[in-house]
């Protein structure tokens, strides 16, 4: 309850300021050096406010893992040092550095759905579109970054959110609870973000016994192995690889095919 009250007060405080909201997705960049609002949805917070938000968001996310707003708040208020490490990894990689420079966004306003639909069967773009259709999800459900007090790091965590469904596609995981837990294990190994580690450790609490057996005996070892073997997935410019066969991209990244029986579990 305290977290929700704090969120509401921060939103109210922000709403009293003049604001210009972009009509479409734009790269996250600072408007000027020294400006307190560093990007369009930025809400400056003190260390104490971040601590309170993190504690409350963690509790809410554990109680209801589908509260994506609370998961987002938890990620932004606990991952500063990890985000710096991920940012530095991107800067050292040519493809990652290009992403940081160009700041691409993944949303319905930036995706050419008709082009994706026209791509060959088995291509990354076609399989990503199939994932969205089958699981009835939209890239527009990703919350904007608000509580990261650095515009470059804000983009890094925004990029992580927007490629989350791409990781589902790469790993062949559905959006049920079991699939989400498996992806969280992969992300935890890949990124080290506290919210990913928390989701990986506590997500299994809500799974059935049959799913738990498969998770611990097969899926967690598979996710950890792939997470360690693959290069940083934030360094992949997915939008420039739509035509690449999904199997070829998996092979390039060292990601082995997903277990066949995952779809029947929840």
From Swiss-Prot:
According to its UniProt entry, one GO biological process term is: ubiquinone biosynthetic process
Span of chain positions assigned to the transit peptide in the UniProt entry: 1-30
Reported function: Lyase that catalyzes the C1-decarboxylation of 4-hydroxy-3-methoxy-5-(all-trans-decaprenyl)benzoic acid into 2-methoxy-6-(all-trans-decaprenyl)phenol during ubiquinone biosynthesis.
- The name this protein carries in UniProt is Ubiquinone biosynthesis protein COQ4 homolog, mitochondrial
Q: Which PANTHER family match?
A: UBIQUINONE BIOSYNTHESIS PROTEIN, UBIQUINONE BIOSYNTHESIS PROTEIN COQ4 HOMOLOG, MITOCHONDRIAL
Name positions with the PTM Phosphoserine.
109
Any GO molecular function: 4-hydroxy-3-methoxy-5-polyprenylbenzoate decarboxylase activity
Q: Where in the cell is it found?
A: Mitochondrion inner membrane
Binding positions for Zn(2+)? 164-165, 168, 180
Say which species the protein is native to.
Mus musculus (Mouse)
Q: Which reaction does it catalyse?
A: 4-hydroxy-3-methoxy-5-(all-trans-decaprenyl)benzoate + H(+) = 2-methoxy-6-(all-trans-decaprenyl)phenol + CO2
> Which pathway or pathways does this protein act in?
Cofactor biosynthesis; ubiquinone biosynthesis
Q: What is its EC number?
A: 4.1.1.130
């Amino acid at each position: 309850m305290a977290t929700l009250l704090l969120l509401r007060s921060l939103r109210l405080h922000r709403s009293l300021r003049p604001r210009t909201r972009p009509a479409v997705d734009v790269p996250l960049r600072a408007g000027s050096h020294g400006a307190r609002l560093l990007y369009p949805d930025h809400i400056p917070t003190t260390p104490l406010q971040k601590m309170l938000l993190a504690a409350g968001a963690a509790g809410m996310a554990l109680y209801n893992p589908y509260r994506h707003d609370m998961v987002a708040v938890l990620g932004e208020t606990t991952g500063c040092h990890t985000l710096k490490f991920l940012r530095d990894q991107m800067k050292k990689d040519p493809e990652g550095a290009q992403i940081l420079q160009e700041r691409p966004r993944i949303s319905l306003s930036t995706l050419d759905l008709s082009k994706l639909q026209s791509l060959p069967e088995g291509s990354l773009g076609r399989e990503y579109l199939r994932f969205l259709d089958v699981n009835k999800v939209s890239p527009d459900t990703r919350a904007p970054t608000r509580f990261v007090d650095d515009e470059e790091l804000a983009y890094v965590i925004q990029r992580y959110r927007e490629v989350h469904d791409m990781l589902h596609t790469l790993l062949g995981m559905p959006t049920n609870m079991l699939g989400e837990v498996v992806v969280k294990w992969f992300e935890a190994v890949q990124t080290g973000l506290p919210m990913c580690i928390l989701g990986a450790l506590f997500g299994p609490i809500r799974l059935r016994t049959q799913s738990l057996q498969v998770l611990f005996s097969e899926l967690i070892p598979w996710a950890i192995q792939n997470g360690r073997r693959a290069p940083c997935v934030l360094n992949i410019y997915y939008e420039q690889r739509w035509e690449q066969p999904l199997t070829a991209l998996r092979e390039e990244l060292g990601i082995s095919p997903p277990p066949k029986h995952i779809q029947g579990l929840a």
